[in-house]
A protein has these predicted regions:
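Membrane-proximal helix-turn-helix segments that form the acceptor-binding/catalytic region
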Residues: 79-83, 99, 106-107, 115, ...
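Conserved donor-binding/catalytic core segment of Leloir-type glycosyltransferases
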Residues: 178-196, 201-207, 212-213
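N-terminal subdomain of nucleotide-sugar transferases
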Residues: 1-43, 85, 149, 203-208, ...
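Nucleotide-sugar-dependent
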Residues: 196, 238-277, 287-295
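An aromatic- and histidine-rich active-site surface loop
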Residues: 13-15, 70-77, 89-109, 117
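Donor nucleotide-sugar binding/catalytic pocket of nucleotide-sugar-dependent glycosyltransferases
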Residues: 137-178
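A charged, aromatic-enriched C-terminal amphipathic alpha-helix characteristic of glycosyltransferases
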Residues: 307-311, 321-359
Length: 366
């Protein structure tokens, strides 16, 4: 049986990719981030679902060492889960996991490595931040070039173009069959920073008596928690899609607003992965014109694209509450059309990677 191993972080619906990959070979998913988690998928069915373990590695230490311990940790996890057996393909995200995959390829533990690049951080800000981003950018370009293929979650990410076999990876939108009734709350998923404008959401929810659910955490969120309405529920960091889905099934609106909508913002280059989880539970989203995927949200009617100002955000939230069934139907149509392309991409690319002697691949998409 063919075997695929995924060494990833959390947030980009890696489970969806694992499910699609498992239709072509047994797939082991290793998620290594604020939460460590492992799964095994076979023929589109999850056969093992490991516990969620909150990691205690300091982000500051991880950044100072450029993720070196993460490379070692991913290699050790690979050996433990595969019992040292060889895999056919390793799909990785971030330079840390890709470096681990490239080492495993070098010693003969896998045939192919795919580097998945989820974001691009422009070297802007303070001097120390610019230096750090230039170094991590160099590492990402290096591992992308050395991989067999490089996939970017957005066509705006330039990093993967160092590899002649680069593609744009469309991410799956799940369907959790959430009910369309009983939608009275608002949901937010993420690691809040001042750019996320969650303080504006606090004000709007307080004004209209809306219950807000917050998944995620950050030092910034802790510093402004006192501004939240008293009925706000802070669920913390979790990777359990079932728990998240139970809450989002009560939400009529999701929030993905960014203050910085310039071409130099990190959100301009990535994909608003929180929107995928919201859409999986038929939750329309209020967002700003940042990522390339935002154009799809606007054209499909699956949400409202606004400027990051309170009046427009408030108006959009109230419109979604008043016309939720219209937005929900738009999400269903978007999911059907979008996922057809997602399945085709995974079937074509993973089949080619699993072949002993790969057939000529389709022309890479820039």
């Amino acid at each position: 049986m063919k075997q695929v191993v995924m060494l990833t972080g959390i947030g980009n619906n890696d489970r969806g990719t694992a499910r699609l990959a498992s239709e072509l070979g047994r797939t082991i998913l290793v998620q290594d981030g604020p939460i460590a988690h492992e799964e095994v998928w076979e023929n589109g069915v999850r056969t093992y679902d490991g516990p969620e373990i909150h990691t205690h590695e300091s982000r500051l230490i991880a950044e100072a060492t450029f993720g070196f311990m993460g490379i070692i940790r991913n290699i050790r996890t690979y050996y433990r889960l595969t019992r040292g057996e060889k895999s056919d393909v390793i799909l990785t995200s971030a330079y840390v996991q890709t470096a681990a995959g490239l080492w495993l390829r070098a010693i003969g533990k896998t045939r192919k490595v795919v580097c998945i690049v989820s974001d691009y951080l422009p070297p802007t800000g303070s001097l120390s931040l610019r230096i750090h981003r230039r170094i991590t950018g160099f590492f990402t370009r290096l591992v992308a070039r050395l991989s067999d293929e490089a996939w970017a979650v957005s066509p705006r990410i330039p990093t993967v173009k160092v590899n002649p076999h680069h593609f744009v990876l469309p991410l799956l939108i799940d369907d959790n069959h959430a009910p369309v009734t009983g939608r009275e709350e608002i949901g937010y998923i993420g690691f809040p920073s001042p750019d996320h404008a969650i303080d504006l959401l606090f004000e709007i929810c307080r004004k209209h008596g809306l219950k807000l659910n917050v998944f995620g955490d950050s030092a910034y969120l802790q510093s402004i928690k006192h501004l939240a309405p008293p009925n706000t529920v802070f669920h913390g960091i979790t990777n359990d899609t079932s728990k998240i889905g139970q809450v989002l099934a009560r939400c009529f609106c999701g929030y993905a607003v960014y203050r910085d909508t310039s071409p130099n913002s990190y959100s301009h280059f990535g994909v608003p992965s929180k929107c995928l989880q919201l859409f999986a539970n038929n939750v329309p989203v209020v967002t700003t014109n940042t990522a390339h995927f935002t154009q799809t949200i606007a054209s499909s009617g699956a949400g409202c694209v606004v400027e990051p100002v309170p009046e427009q955000i408030e108006r959009a939230i109230l419109d979604i509450r008043a016309r939720y069934p219209v937005y929900s139907d738009a999400i269903n149509r978007l999911r059907d059309s979008w996922n057809a392309g997602v399945r085709q991409f995974h079937r074509e690319r993973i089949s080619a990677l699993l072949e002993a002697t790969p057939a000529p691949a389709a022309q890479p998409r820039s």
